[in-house]
Amino acid sequence: MKARGWRSKLPRVLIGGIGIVVAIAIVSEISSDRDVGGELIVDVPTPTIESRSWAVGQEPTGVIFDGERLWIAETGFGTVTSYGLEGQRLDTADVGGQPAVLASGAGFVWALDADDGSVTQLDSDANVVRKFQVGLEPAGLVFLGDHLWVSDPTRGSVSKISIQGALAQLLEIGVSPGAITKTPEQVLVVDGETLTVTGIDTEGKIVGSFEYPDQITMGDFEHVPGSPTAFLSTPNALWIAFGGIGQVMRLTPAGTFSGLTRVPTGPLALAWSGNELWVVSTDAATITRISGTGTIVETHDIGGHPTSIAHDGNHGWVTDDEKNVLIQFTPVELVP
């Protein structure tokens, strides 16, 4: 099936990535406890990536960069902790439950607990501002236009929530809206049941939608995408990851299918380095670097059980929920 374009034209300028990542050697430095600065216990060179690691809280499953510091959802502890760019632990909030998905904006950080349908709002010092319910089984959240946007595939909705935690609008979106991302002007949500991407502007108006292919023939193989695992917008493309078939689909900003890139199967996480898409595969313990045009630059075996990835402009950051570490990936030209 050929993907259809936008039914109503959406802005084509999408969120820009930051930083350019080109890595050439690896050194793994892991501290012996949650504090930074532990003794070097691993030094295994692996070509093409430079890395350092620090111990963090139990079962880190989500990481974001808010422009100044890193925030990690430590699901096993029921905490959210901020970290400096040298790996130092800064502040910790006990939010309870199982925080897993994070978003930031307007000086706040929000932690989504999909198990109990709640979001905890934190200030920049990790003080709990408020906690509120957002849906039945919320799956993703982003912050845009002074509002938090939360997708809920069970309820088939996207909620627009004010900074004060009040429900400003409830939009019914398709059947099962799940993975969510944003551009500077709109929120984009993908529905794996209807194979649809829907755009919502900051006023809460649905401004357009398109369908992505339900079957793609490449060579002798036919690919059926299945349920989206992750979704990310970059300056010239939309990327939808399908962990079940081990593929990342590239779409133009207007919604036209422009290719598939093979990656390992299983849970996947995405980040943009400035000119490459970084795909973390949990089951394969790899990072696959993909160019802006969809070709594989290189695949790196990083070991462990990586769960999420973020980028700060100079470094990539990956969490590992088995080793309970935060791993920093640094471009070689930036290493002293």
Which ranges hold each PLM region?
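Predominantly soluble domains enriched in secretory-pathway, periplasmic, or organellar proteins
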Residues: G5, K9, V13, G17, ...
